[in-house]
């Protein structure tokens, strides 16, 4: 059987908070080994979209298709077994556990694609150096690396990253970009929420611009770079 064209396909996704509609009929795709960003102002619906794809936001309609199979009715654990990995903007680090315990705690959901602890330490050497530190003793950038590494160790092949560069020093943002490009080269897909458009342009293949819960522009990276100022003015960013 031929491999599905898209790792992820979202069709007609709408979502609500009570009576307030947060997403309006969103369509998007993420290919195998592709990095796609969601760009927009605060409140545009970017995080709600990630949460809906992961199955964490239940007040949603439309379909989420993973590797050609409709996953819309699956709970978050079942979607994780299909290869989805969620990295929230608060990183979700367990304060009472060491770095290594944080890495080992989540279950391996896809053994065939799970990174070993040695693979994690090879790609994230700072985590080996800090293995016995409490997770929340790490810097913001180190915590972001830990959150990403933990999801890769579980076997995720499509990462949902929410604002990975937020609040980080430029040199750390550069390192996060290097990691994203490395896992992309290994075939991992990424759907990335990001307001740092300079960073987004260094890692992404395509971009979806969101405003008031709608995708208002979809562009490849070359067009995004060429029209950057115009687009940011349009979005009020």
Each model region followed by its residue ranges:
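Catalytic Walker B motif of ABC-type/P-loop ATPase nucleotide-binding domains
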Residues: 159-163
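ABC ATPase NBD Q-loop/coupling interface
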Residues: 63-80, 221-224
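Helix-to-loop junction immediately C-terminal to a conserved catalytic motif
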Residues: 54
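ABC-type ATPase nucleotide-binding domains, specifically the catalytic core motifs of the NBD
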Residues: 18, 59, 74, 99-117, ...
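A short, proline-enriched helix->beta-strand linker immediately N-terminal to the Walker B motif
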Residues: 152-157
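Conserved ABC ATPase signature
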Residues: 134-138, 142
């Amino acid at each position: 059987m031929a491999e599905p064209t898209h790792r992820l396909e979202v069709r007609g996704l709408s979502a609500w908070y009570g009576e307030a509609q947060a997403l309006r009929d969103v369509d998007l795709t993420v290919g195998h080994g592709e990095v796609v960003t969601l760009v927009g102002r605060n409140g545009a619906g970017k995080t709600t979209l990630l949460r809906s794809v992961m199955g964490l936001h239940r007040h949603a309609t439309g379909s989420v298709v993973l590797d050609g199979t409709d996953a819309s009715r699956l709970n978050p654990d079942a979607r994780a077994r299909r290869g989805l990995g969620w990295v929230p903007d608060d990183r979700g680090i367990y304060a009472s556990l060491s770095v290594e315990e944080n890495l080992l705690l989540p279950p391996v959901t896809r053994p065939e694609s799970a990174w070993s602890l040695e693979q994690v330490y090879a790609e994230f050497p700072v985590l080996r150096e800090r293995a016995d530190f409490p997770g929340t003793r790490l810097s913001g950038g180190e915590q972001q690396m830990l959150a990403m590494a933990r999801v890769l160790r579980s076997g995720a092949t499509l990462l949902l990253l929410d604002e990975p560069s937020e609040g980080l020093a430029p040199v750390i943002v550069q390192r996060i970009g290097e990691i994203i490009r490395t896992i992309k080269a290994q075939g991992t897909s990424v759907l990335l929420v990001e307001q740092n458009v300079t960073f987004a342009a260094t890692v992404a293949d395509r971009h979806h611009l969101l405003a008031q819960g709608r995708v208002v522009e979809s562009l490849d990276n070359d067009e995004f770079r060429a029209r950057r100022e115009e687009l940011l003015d349009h979005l009020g960013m």
